[in-house]
Amino acid sequence: MASLLAKDAYLQSLAKKICSHSAPEQQARTRAGKTQGSETAGPPKKKRKKTQKKFRKREEKAAEHKAKSLGEKSPAASGARRPEAAKEEAAWASSSAGNPADGLATEPESVFALDVLRQRLHEKIQEARGQGSAKELSPAALEKRRRRKQERDRKKRKRKELRAKEKARKAEEATEAQEVVEATPEGACTEPREPPGLIFNKVEVSEDEPASKAQRRKEKRQRVKGNLTPLTGRNYRQLLERLQARQSRLDELRGQDEGKAQELEAKMKWTNLLYKAEGVKIRDDERLLQEALKRKEKRRAQRQRRWEKRTAGVVEKMQQRQDRRRQNLRRKKAARAERRLLRARKKGRILPQDLERAGLV
């Protein structure tokens, strides 16, 4: 910003110098015209006041002072612009010297020069607000700009390559899909799809809609083999009751018909074996069920005892806090009564307690 101010001050001072150079020549021409006319014409006219010249001198002094103050801050910028300013000054001097007879046109030319210089100054300011010219940048800044440009070009090329690859892949997929559609016969689409099977390296998922609750219940009943629900789960009491009910039914059937009882028992064993082959854990051992039930009841009793102990501890702690609170309240009440009696004794009152202690009552 200091360099811009220095340029502005220098251009303004240059324009004022050009105007001041043209002013003496104009005055000399007017003096010559007046002397020639005075010889031929009548009495001399009054001289005009040189207010314009004084105003220009004042402006020149202010501009020089401003240029000095800014030149101390940025001497390099002002020095860099000196050759161009010298050329412009020489051009304006030659133009003013080439037309000595045209005295009336010097003032508009100076105004035009100021406009041109001001326009150039605005162009420089706009250039500095932007990226700036490459001549004024340091080598490090130029190298940084070059690297940034290379990086932008590289990213642009990479994006273009990715777009081209994506486009080629989509076109290839479209052609493959078209070939598959053309290769499949029309009757193949109407055939019902077989239920998906389990392959160890591949799992096929059917596109059927999820079954409702009633459908799932029906499928579960169909999965029950031989109308025999498997004895699974961790509700040992229920499992033991079911197992005992089966044994009682077998005993009743054995009392009626031994052959049917043996057939039913064999059917139950085969059904349990089929369930076990599928990975279902069958709990059909009465001894193990009783032991598991005892362990479960024991753990439940232990949890119940721990809970009761914890509850009793909580109640005991609450009672202790209540007793401590009541004791503190009684102590505070006794202390307040003692303080009241002490204040009464200080005032000279004779209390019944004092009479009892003295044995006067």
From Swiss-Prot:
Compositional bias per record (Low complexity), positions renumbered to this chain: 177-186
Subcellular location, record wording: Nucleus, Nucleoplasm; Nucleus, Nucleolus
Protein name, entry field: Surfeit locus protein 6
Residue span of motif Nuclear localization signal: 45-49, 154-158
Listed GO biological process terms: ribosomal large subunit biogenesis; ribosomal small subunit biogenesis
Biased composition (Basic residues): 44-56, 144-162, 214-224, 299-308
Keywords linked to the UniProt accession: DNA-binding, Nucleus, Phosphoprotein, RNA-binding
Role noted for this protein: Binds to both DNA and RNA in vitro, with a stronger binding capacity for RNA. May represent a nucleolar constitutive protein involved in ribosomal biosynthesis or assembly.
Chief location of this protein within or outside the cell: nucleus
Disulfide bonds: none
InterPro entries associated with the record: Rrp14/SURF6_C, SURF6
The keyword DNA-binding is assigned to this record: yes
Residues modified as Phosphothreonine: T229
Pfam families: SURF6
Residue ranges with Polar residues bias: 23-39
Molecular function GO labels: DNA binding; molecular condensate scaffold activity; RNA binding
Family per similarity comment: Belongs to the SURF6 family.
Composition-biased stretches (Basic and acidic residues): 57-71, 81-90, 163-173
